[in-house]
Every structure is written in structure tokens, then in C-alpha cells.
């Protein structure tokens, strides 16, 4: 039982770690694909942003020959109308027409060459197709966002879970997304595929020059450095949350959980070894009899490993069943999307390595120690000497020390989580409900507010550009102060 529990923890944490470490490693030009990152320093505040102004990408593509491809993305939840019903907070992308060829995403339905070529074409994922069009073909269906009509021209395969890009609906550049220039719209994630001999430092300096030219005197009171980060490094990169829509990971948290899982696995293996030792008298007599019949030590060691392998295999099956029950809770806690995908060959490679490591840890001491004694010692029981007892005591001490250490760590983690959950947010969040998708209300907001206020269960209604104040925006505006135009960064 203890071995199954420790293996369950190792499986859950191991699959999650594999998912974290393989983020964005599947793009066709992943070794040459970069995203623009910028460092702004304004009024003593430093900000690292993964967003850019819309013109930066197109100018850079035109002027820098080492940039082979360029693609821009605005990622945000949007209000989208399906079948005359508005759905708020739909994960959406507004992007350039080369999005699919750039990232290598393919379509399940529709022609990849033409499906995203029009100005009013939209692509949805297969999960979105099942969600919004469960009993009909979504191709050709009309959807609406921000007052613009679109027609679904393709269904793409779901974006892999270990991608920093998340979306259900893909839109082309439209409306104000098209018109944004240097004076607004600091929302674009800009990606480049570079030539193999590209100089990253030189490109960063050239991008900063393009920024300074485009922003002219808006950057006179600010410093701006532009760099490039490999797309495969995005998941663990450090950027301001309001200026990066990518799903982020934490290497320190990853290392802590992996170390904890390994400690738990070792504890389970030690407990298993102690159980082997507790039946040592019976096993020793059996070893002595086999040796008297001509069995060699190597043969006996292999038998121990075979017996251990049977127990470990049963424990792995039990651990898998427990992992299936535990993963939803773990995902809710970590915010991950880890799944037990039995069609993924990585799962079987991981399980094979886990089984081998567990067999070696759990079975090595009984196999080598108990087969060391001679025929007379084992049959006569002389093997139960001081060395065996000392080693067993050491295992028990290690087991209890590790267990107590884990309990202390869990206690302090629990206290930290309780502290975070009990922090004063500056407002009362009880009985407060919000809808993410403010832009979809448009001019109808006042009418909607008046209708909602008629409901006796609703005390009041208000609108805010971003989520209830737990998330800030990412934008740049221009304001005229005392006759001077200055840049304001919405942090």
C-alpha cells in the first residue's frame, strides 16, 4: 500500500514535470523561433514585457534580412456570439494570416491554404466545435465578435496542452486591431523565425532603433531595450503578468515538487525493504536450502529482483489507478493540464524508468545482503547479527527523518497558503460576480445594466476594462500634459 501511494505521487509529479519541461518543443522551426521581449524603465519603474507595438514586426520583417518569417498575436478572452447567444471569456487569438504555417498547426476540417486567407474567416478548435456546435457541422456557421461578422472556414486540431498559446477561436486582424499604430495597442506578441546565422544582439539593437523612431519623443523620458527569447524558453521566462498572456511555470516550484516526490518514493522503497527484512528468517532458510542444492549467488539475486519486480508492477498498477483519481485535484492546485494519456509513448518510457529505479532501490539490499551469507549461517540463523540490525535501524531512522521533514514542509506550505487566502484584498469579494468580456457589451452596456438592476437579487452593476482589480492591463496611451505629449504605460 505504501509503495503504491509513493508511486502514485511520483507518477503525478513526474508527468507534470515532463509536461512542464517539454513546453513549446514541437514547433517545426522551434530552434530558430523567437519572441520579442522588451525592458522599459519609466519614472524609476522597470517593466519586462512580452508585448510590442503592432508596426514593430512588419517594419523589422521588411528591413532585416535575417528575419525569415514574422507573426503577431493578440491573445485575450473575448465575447463571441454562437447561434445568437453571447459567450463571454472565450479564449481567442487575433493574428496574422500566416499563423498556421508559422507555428505548424494543422486543420482537421478545411483547406489550410485558403481557410484563413479572408478578412472575415475564423478558425475554431475541435473542442470548441464540440462545445458550441455539438450536433452540426461548424463550417460556414456565422459568429460575431466586437460587432463584426465572421464565418467559420476551418476546424483545427486542439492546440497541445504544453503550448504557451491557448485559444478556442482564431480571428484575423480586424477592426481596431488593424488600425493600432505607435500611439496605442501595446498588445501584440511578435514572433520571428530567424536565419541560422542571425546575430540576436544586433537584431535586438535594431528593434530598439525601430521603437525609438516610431515612438519619437514618447520615449524621451524612458529607456527601452529590446531582446529576443527562444519560444521554447517562454514557459519559464520572467515577464510582468500584465504584459504576457503565456502560461507560465516556476522552475523553483518544479524542483521542490520533484525532490519531494523522490523523497516520498525513497520512503516507500525503504518501507518495502523493511518488510522484506521482517521476513528475513524464512527467506534465509530458503536461500540456504537453494544454495545447498547448487544455486549460485547470481541466480538468487535475480530471483530477489524478480520477486521485487512483481510487487513493484502491482504497486505501479495501483499507483496509476490512484493517479487517475488524484490528477484533477493536483491540476486544480497547480493550475496545470496534466493528463494520463495512454496513447502518449512518453508515458510508457516514464513508467518503465520508474519501475526500473524502484526495483533497484527497493530490491538491492535484500538481494545482495541476504544472499551473501553461507549455507550454515542462513540455515542456522547466524545472519541475524549486529550488522543486519544496524542497517535496519539506519533505514528506520532515514524513513522517520524524511517523513518528519515532509510533515514540517507541508505544515509551513499550508500556513503560507492560508496566509495568502486570508490577505485583505482591499474590497469585499463575497457575492461579487463578474463577466470577462467587457468589449462585447459596446453601446448596449447601459441597457444591459438597467435590465440587470431590475433583478431583486442584484444589488448593483458596474463595468471595468479589466478583471476585478486582481489583474491589471497592458497598454500604452498618449496624453497631453501642459502642451507636451507623454507616454503613459498602463501597468
Q: Where are these predicted regions, by residue range?
A:
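Membrane-helix entry/capping segments
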Residues: 26-27, 208-263, 281-282, 296, ...
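Short juxtamembrane loops and helix-capping segments at transmembrane helix boundaries
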Residues: 21-30, 39-41, 166-177, 237-245, ...
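The feature marks short, hydrophobic/small-residue-biased sequence motifs that occur predominantly
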Residues: 55, 64, 73-74, 81-111, ...
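Membrane-proximal extracellular/periplasmic loop immediately following the first transmembrane helix
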Residues: 13-79, 178-179, 183-191, 204-206, ...
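Short, strongly hydrophobic transmembrane alpha-helices
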Residues: 1-21, 31, 389-416, 427
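Intracellular coupling helices
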Residues: 1-2, 268-311, 372-383
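Small-residue-rich transmembrane alpha-helices
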Residues: 11-15, 227, 308-375, 415
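Mid-to-C-terminal secondary-structure elements
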Residues: 95-109, 121-252, 447-491
Amino acid at each position: 500500500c505504501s509503495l503504491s501511494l509513493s508511486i502514485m505521487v511520483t507518477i503525478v509529479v513526474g508527468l507534470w514535470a515532463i509536461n512542464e519541461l517539454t513546453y513549446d518543443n514541437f514547433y517545426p522551426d522551434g530552434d530558430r523561433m523567437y519572441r520579442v521581449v522588451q525592458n522599459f524603465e519609466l519614472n524609476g519603474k522597470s517593466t519586462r514585457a512580452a508585448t510590442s507595438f503592432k508596426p514593430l514586426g512588419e517594419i523589422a520583417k521588411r528591413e532585416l534580412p535575417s528575419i525569415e518569417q514574422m507573426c503577431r498575436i493578440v491573445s485575450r478572452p473575448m465575447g463571441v456570439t454562437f447561434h445568437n447567444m453571447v459567450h463571454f471569456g472565450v479564449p481567442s487569438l487575433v493574428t496574422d494570416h500566416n499563423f498556421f504555417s508559422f507555428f505548424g498547426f494543422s486543420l482537421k476540417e478545411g483547406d489550410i491554404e485558403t481557410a484563413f486567407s479572408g478578412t472575415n474567416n475564423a478558425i475554431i478548435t475541435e473542442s470548441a466545435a464540440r462545445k458550441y456546435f455539438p450536433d452540426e457541422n461548424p463550417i460556414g456557421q456565422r459568429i460575431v465578435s466586437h460587432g463584426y461578422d465572421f464565418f467559420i472556414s476551418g476546424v483545427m486540431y486542439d492546440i497541445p496542452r504544453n503550448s504557451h498559446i491557448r485559444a478556442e477561436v482564431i480571428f484575423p486582424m480586424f477592426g481596431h486591431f488593424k488600425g493600432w499604430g505607435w500611439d496605442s495597442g501595446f498588445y501584440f506578441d511578435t514572433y520571428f523565425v530567424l536565419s541560422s546565422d542571425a546575430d540576436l544582439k544586433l537584431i535586438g539593437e535594431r528593434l530598439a532603433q525601430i521603437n525609438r523612431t516610431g515612438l519619437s519623443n514618447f520615449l524621451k523620458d524612458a529607456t527601452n531595450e529590446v531582446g529576443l527569447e527562444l519560444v521554447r524558453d517562454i514557459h519559464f521566462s520572467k515577464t510582468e503578468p500584465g504584459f504576457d498572456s503565456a502560461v507560465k511555470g516556476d522552475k523553483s516550484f518544479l524542483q521542490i515538487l520533484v525532490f519531494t516526490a523522490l523523497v516520498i518514493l525513497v520512503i516507500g522503497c525503504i518501507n518495502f525493504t523493511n518488510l522484506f527484512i521482517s521476513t528475513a528468517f524464512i527467506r534465509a532458510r530458503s536461500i540456504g536450502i537453494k544454495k545447498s542444492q547448487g544455486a549460485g549467488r547470481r541466480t538468487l539475486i535475480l530471483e530477489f529482483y524478480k520477486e521485487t519486480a512483481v510487487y513493484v508492477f502491482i504497486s505501479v498498477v495501483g499507483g496509476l489507478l490512484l493517479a487517475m483519481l488524484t490528477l484533477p485535484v493536483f491540476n486544480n492546485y497547480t493550475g496545470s493540464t496534466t493528463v494520463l494519456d495512454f496513447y502518449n509513448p512518453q508515458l510508457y518510457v516514464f513508467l518503465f524508468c520508474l519501475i526500473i529505479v524502484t526495483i533497484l532501490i527497493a530490491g538491492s539490499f535484500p538481494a545482495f545482503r541476504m544472499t551473501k551469507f553461507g549455507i550454515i549461517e542462513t540455515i542456522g540463523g547466524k545472519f541475524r547479527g549486529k550488522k543486519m540490525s544496524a542497517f535496519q535501524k539506519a533505514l528506520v531512522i532515514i524513513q522517520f527523518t524524511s517523513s518528519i521533514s515532509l510533515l514540517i514542509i507541508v505544515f509551513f506550505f499550508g500556513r503560507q497558503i492560508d496566509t495568502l487566502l486570508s490577505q485583505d484584498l482591499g474590497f469585499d469579494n463575497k457575492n461579487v460576480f463578474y463577466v470577462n468580456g467587457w468589449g462585447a457589451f459596446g453601446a448596449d452596456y447601459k441597457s444591459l445594466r438597467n435590465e440587470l438592476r431590475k433583478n431583486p437579487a442584484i444589488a448593483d452593476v458596474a463595468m471595468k476594462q479589466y478583471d476585478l482589480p486582481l489583474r491589471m492591463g497592458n497598454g500604452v496611451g498618449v496624453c497631453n500634459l501642459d502642451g507636451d505629449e507623454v507616454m503613459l504605460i498602463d501597468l
